[in-house]
Amino acid sequence: ITARDLDLTFTTNDGPVHALKDVNLDINKGDFVSFIGPSGCGKTTFLRCIAGLETPTSGDISVNGLTPDQARQARAYGYVFQAAGLYPWRTIGGNIKLPLEIMGFDKAEQAERVKRVMDLVDLTGFDRKFPWQLSGGMQQRASIARALAFDADILLMDEPFGALDEIVRDHLNEQLLKLWARTEKTIAFVTHSIPEAVYLSTKIVVM
């Protein structure tokens, strides 16, 4: 991921709001990069620019050598939000395979990928459970599995453990590091916690 002279200004009734200004950054393949800073400093906005969910006012950003829109079409990244965002009427396995259904994978491939990513996040055997039957931490692991299901190179994570208690968060951080070591994904991780960023990251970006 490469950003050069990236600016993003929002127009509001109270005047312009400069969400990002002169951002220059390189994230290399296999890096685990954490973004920290106070609320409103642009951490989530930058992640949304990577994902093509926000359009910069000026400057350039590329993902695997592609524009953010091209990278999205190429399935270059998975996105994990602070809320797990699981559909309550679908089983855990059904939630994880949803993007695979949308992308047109055949049923055999869907089943194989769901099993593989559930094993990766230590949710083996929970595929027929519904979200309400799982703890908050387990639901978030299912959300991570869903983002991994289509085998994207990059994982974008926006405060994925921010709503969880400290003991659960520490456990999930350990699991995330093991997952990163096994998959060699590139991870961009937004957090408010300096200790969490120090524990997880190969690089920390202060915004």
Regions found by a protein language model. Name each.
Residues I36-P38:
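The feature captures the beta-strand-to-loop junction immediately N-terminal to the Walker
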Residues A51:
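Helix-to-loop junction immediately C-terminal to a conserved catalytic motif
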Residues G59-D69:
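Conserved ABC transporter NBD signature motif
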Residues R90-K97:
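Short coil-to-helix segment of the ABC ATPase nucleotide-binding domain corresponding to the Q-loop/switch region
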Residues K97, E101, A108-F126, K178:
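Conserved ABC ATPase "signature" region
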Residues K129-W132, F150:
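Conserved signature/switch motifs of ABC ATPase nucleotide-binding domains
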Residues L155-D158:
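Catalytic Walker B motif of ABC-type/P-loop ATPase nucleotide-binding domains
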